[in-house]
């Protein structure tokens, strides 16, 4: 089955048709012979929802079989249905109904991503890592990936920018300690130390996004200091304006790079001025 077929499907029923293509029968497989999907983009599972599903399975059984592929003789990897698998595991049942499919790594990764996107259950970090994994495996552009998963190219790029944040910040998003908008605002800061430090302030003060952005502007020197020192006010204003201009240029360059353009950025400071050189190679 061509990998492109998976990316071309946006309707859940169409995805189910692909997963179940060529199915001959449902088997009862031993639970201890099944292991989770190595390409599962979701790393955080809602235990309450799994417990609720387990209660339903206890009464009605597993109505929809999981889908697996055989990795070694009598050992299987889950392709779809990990929540059902976890629910059955919590019930300490010995077997689970399953359908065996022959799919390669790229197809399995695509199914796992699209299935979760359709259910809107991924955190922003999980989604970003899934995009990166698919880009690495398939060697496609962000634009091509966006078309195949039904997203805009800018949405893909913005999600993947979150992976530039320190692991501590990514974990906070993953665990829903801060929102995606909080995390995105932290990208304006220049160092990881600043980002981690501000994360601590956000959590300690329970700041919303607007308050966080205001604090970032203070850090970047856009807002006037609380202190009202009047020594050399003109020089301070000019210095502040220069910082604003420099930060604006740097952020613009970063945005262009994130959108896939290859360019070189150099910065030089003299006694009289800052010199910025941007080189964009001509396409041959």
UniProtKB/Swiss-Prot annotation:
Subcellular location: Cytoplasm, Nucleoid
Keyword set, alphabetical order: Cell cycle, Cell division, Cytoplasm, DNA-binding, Septation
InterPro entries given in the database record: Chromosome_partition/occlusion (IPR050336), HTH_ParB/Spo0J (IPR041468), Nucleoid_occlusion_protein (IPR023705), ParB/RepB/Spo0J (IPR004437), ParB/Sulfiredoxin_dom (IPR003115), ParB/Sulfiredoxin_sf (IPR036086)
Single GO MF annotation: DNA binding
Primary location class: cytoplasm
Regions recorded as binding DNA: 143-162
Xref: Pfam families: HTH_ParB, ParBc
Domain of life: Bacteria
GO annotations of cellular component type: chromosome; cytoplasm; nucleoid
Keyword presence, Cytoplasm: yes
Any one GO biological process: positive regulation of sporulation resulting in formation of a cellular spore
Chain's role: Effects nucleoid occlusion by binding relatively nonspecifically to DNA and preventing the assembly of the division machinery in the vicinity of the nucleoid, especially under conditions that disturb the cell cycle. It helps to coordinate cell division and chromosome segregation by preventing the formation of the Z ring through the nucleoid, which would cause chromosome breakage.
HAMAP family cross-referenced by the UniProt entry: ParB_Noc (MF_02015)
NCBIfam families tied to this protein: nucleoid_noc (TIGR04285), parB_part (TIGR00180)
Family: Belongs to the ParB family.
Protein name: Nucleoid occlusion protein
Organism: Listeria innocua serovar 6a (strain ATCC BAA-680 / CLIP 11262)
Gene name linked to the record: noc
